[in-house]
Amino acid sequence: MPTPVDAFHNFHPVTRAWFERTLGTPTLPQQDAWPAIQAGHHTLIAAPTGSGKTLAAFYVAIDRLLQAALEPGHYRTATTVLYVSPLKALGNDIQRNLDVPLAGITALLPEFGLPPVEIRVAVRTGDTPQQQRQHMLKHPPHILVTTPESLYLLLTSKGGRQLLSTISTVILDEIHAMLGDKRGSHLSLSLERLQKLTGARIQRIGLSATQKPIERVAQYLVGMDNQSKGKPDCVIVDSGHKRKLDVTLEVPQSPLTALMSSEVWGEIYQRLEQLTAQHRTTIIFV
């Protein structure tokens, strides 16, 4: 497994600086996935929630876009990264999550003596207003966030095909949720149509919860043309078993009864307040 220093080896100094200053050391999925993605391999990242899967998939693409933007005479306004999510809400979250590193990276450019650049992200779903759809066709985003259904519709229109014709990277999120049903089959067909449209190899990156057998998920990700003797031509980053859990069971000091008194609830609320203040993120199931 590469060390954190090795994980940043091929990154631009600006993208490396933002990550180290803001997030510190890359997570294990990021350390394992980045070299494979930078080498151009199809990559499946299987890791639990909160392990940095999003930047594990996206950060190489962001770095590529930045380096292309800074190279004189080679920067073009074209959509090269396609993110597909089975949920519209998840797609909107991804756009907001990408805005933070993109804004931070571009803000660092003057410090490194580099000119300003713009890397745009747009969402295209059934809820996208017609005015925004037309704007995307005239001013293509560098990263397009969409759903399987909207991808299919884009592939059926002249403007949509033109927008997608420059795609070089596809990121499939929650890929395990689309296996084994008609929606997954439909998306698989759309990916093959997209591959034929571009006329060039498209790098496929999948994000999944830990699944077994993980090889079946990888087969779905790469498609039929990217398999050898039944084995997917894909790097599998399976970090699900590497996450450590610290579990603590606590009970109130007052006796527990079938109908808990307000005193007991008061102790629970007080403890929840303490835990919330001590931690950056807290999830409470009631």
Across the structure, where does each feature detected by a protein language model lie?
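Conserved pre-motif I regulatory segment
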Residues: 2-46
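Motif I (Walker A/P-loop) of helicase-class P-loop NTPases
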Residues: 54-64, 185-191
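Conserved SF1/SF2 helicase motif Ia
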Residues: 63-94, 109-110, 196-201
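Conserved helix-turn-beta segment of the N-terminal RecA-like "Helicase ATP-binding" lobe
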Residues: 90-123, 220-228
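Conserved motor-coupling elements within RecA-like helicase/translocase cores
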Residues: 116-118, 127-144
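Conserved helicase motor
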Residues: 120-132, 149-150, 239-240, 286
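SF2 helicase catalytic motif II
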Residues: 144, 148-152, 156-200
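Conserved interdomain linker/interface between the two RecA-like ATPase lobes of SF2 helicase motors
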Residues: 192, 203-286
